[in-house]
């Protein structure tokens, strides 16, 4: 596009560009600069300024920002719905609330719930621009049991798990129905991303919050949950 604006590329019916006007030159510079900015993304480099509009980092073959924080081995085994969902940044996340909470109780660690969605632009922005931060990723990898719950997933639940919500009276037929009902009934919220920090009994450690694009601030939020958890087990 940039070369076309400069007259270096032409379509069959285009006339010769003998003079490049100032507006055309400015547009060409902007287009070429943006193209150069995006090129590193082909090899997995994070593009934070446009991360909200890009596919999840977990869909890339490799990510240059992954591994920026040391992680410990969890040995948590295969996870329910693990064939459907994939956590970003190599995180050992669960995709079922009860399974994740049971593992947190076993490991005596607090729970980080991420109510998210396939179509959630702000969720992707958090995963691409905040979660890779060294301090944030270290806490998510080592200090919390991460549970990602997709509220818009259309996969049908097993017949035995399909039910009617006591909260809304609506039929819970899909995975998304189940987790959106949990978010609404327990935490009175329906926006994503929505982050909840719990102890091993499922009790709130601190007030839930939504997107926070400041890594330092988000790290402090995670720290506040850790402090509350330590006090609860003393």
State where each predicted segment sits.
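Proteins that catalyze or organize thiol-disulfide redox chemistry
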Residues: 1-113, 117-234
């Amino acid at each position: 596009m940039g070369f076309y604006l400069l007259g270096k590329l032409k379509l069959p019916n285009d006339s010769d560009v003998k003079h490049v006007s100032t507006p055309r030159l400015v547009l060409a510079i902007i287009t070429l600069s943006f193209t150069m900015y995006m090129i590193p993304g082909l090899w997995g480099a994070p593009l934070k300024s446009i991360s909200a509009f890009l596919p999840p980092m977990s869909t890339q073959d490799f990510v240059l920002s992954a591994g920026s924080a040391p992680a410990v081995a969890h040995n948590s085994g295969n996870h329910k719905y693990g064939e459907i969902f994939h956590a970003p940044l190599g995180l050992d996340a669960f995709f079922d609330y009860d399974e994740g909470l049971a593992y947190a109780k076993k490991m005596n660690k607090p729970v980080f719930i991420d109510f998210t969605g396939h179509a959630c632009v702000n969720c992707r922005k958090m995963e691409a621009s905040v979660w890779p931060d060294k301090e944030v990723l270290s806490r998510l990898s080592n200090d919390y049991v991460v549970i990602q719950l997709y509220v818009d997933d259309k996969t049908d639940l097993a017949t035995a798990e399909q039910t009617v919500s006591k909260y809304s009276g609506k039929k819970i037929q899909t995975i998304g129905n189940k987790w959106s009902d949990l978010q609404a009934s327990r935490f009175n919220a329906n926006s994503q991303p929505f982050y909840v920090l719990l102890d091993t009994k499922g009790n709130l450690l601190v007030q839930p919050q939504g997107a926070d694009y400041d890594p330092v601030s988000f790290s402090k939020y995670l720290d506040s949950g850790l402090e509350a958890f330590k006090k609860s087990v003393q």
